[in-house]
Each structure stands twice: as C-alpha cells, then as structure tokens.
Curated annotation (Swiss-Prot):
One GO MF term attached to the UniProt entry: NADH dehydrogenase (ubiquinone) activity
Gene Ontology BP terms: ATP synthesis coupled electron transport
Protein known as: NADH-ubiquinone oxidoreductase chain 4L
Catalytic activity: a ubiquinone + NADH + 5 H(+)(in) = a ubiquinol + NAD(+) + 4 H(+)(out)
The protein's role, per its UniProt record: Core subunit of the mitochondrial membrane respiratory chain NADH dehydrogenase (Complex I) which catalyzes electron transfer from NADH through the respiratory chain, using ubiquinone as an electron acceptor. Part of the enzyme membrane arm which is embedded in the lipid bilayer and involved in proton translocation.
Transmembrane parts of this sequence: 1-21, 29-49, 61-81
Source species: Hylobates lar
Length: 98
C-alpha cells in the first residue's frame, strides 16, 4: 500500500476515533464528520485518477455535494439547539421526548 493511501486511511481512522470519543457535543461531532468526508473525498479522487474510468470520475463531485448538505443540516441543527437550550449537547436532539 503506498504511503499516501495509508496516510488518508489513518486520517479517516483518527476522525472516526474522534467521533467515538467526542460524541457528547454536536460541534465536535460535526468536525469529525467533516474530517471523515475530506479523507473520503481525497481517497475517491485518487482512485478516480488511477482507474481512468469515466463513470467513477463523477464520484468525488457527488461526495462533495453530500458533504455540503451534511454540513448545512448540521450547522442548522447546531444553531437551533444553541438558541433553544444554550448548549450543543447531542442528548438534546432526542426527538422522542414530548
């Protein structure tokens, strides 16, 4: 495995570990998700460059669209939770409460 792939895989694993450790605050979770999406974007771009396939060339663009949607929804939730509760704890996102 080339060194660049190993570094990107390590970046994804560190972001995933951060997501598991810092899961109590929404802002920390969003930052870890963005790190995971960035490493997936770089990995898919490198794969598209190495395979020379026209079908896989659109994959990094689609991944960027999903990352932008995830960031927009996450920031909207963060603003809503911060305005309502004053904190960004994830346990405030429980939708089953009456």
């Amino acid at each position: 495995m080339p060194l660049i792939y190993m570094n990107i895989t390590l970046a994804f694993a560190i972001s995933l570990l951060g997501m598991l450790i810092y899961r109590s605050h929404l802002m920390s979770s969003l930052l870890c998700l963005e790190g995971m999406m960035l490493s997936l974007f770089i990995m898919s771009t490198l794969m598209a460059l190495n395979t020379h396939s026209l079908l896989i060339n659109i994959m990094p663009v689609v991944l960027l669209v999903f990352a932008a949607c995830e960031a927009a929804v996450g920031l909207a939730l963060l603003v809503s939770i911060s305005n309502t509760y004053g904190l960004d704890h994830i346990h405030n996102l429980n939708l089953l409460q009456c």
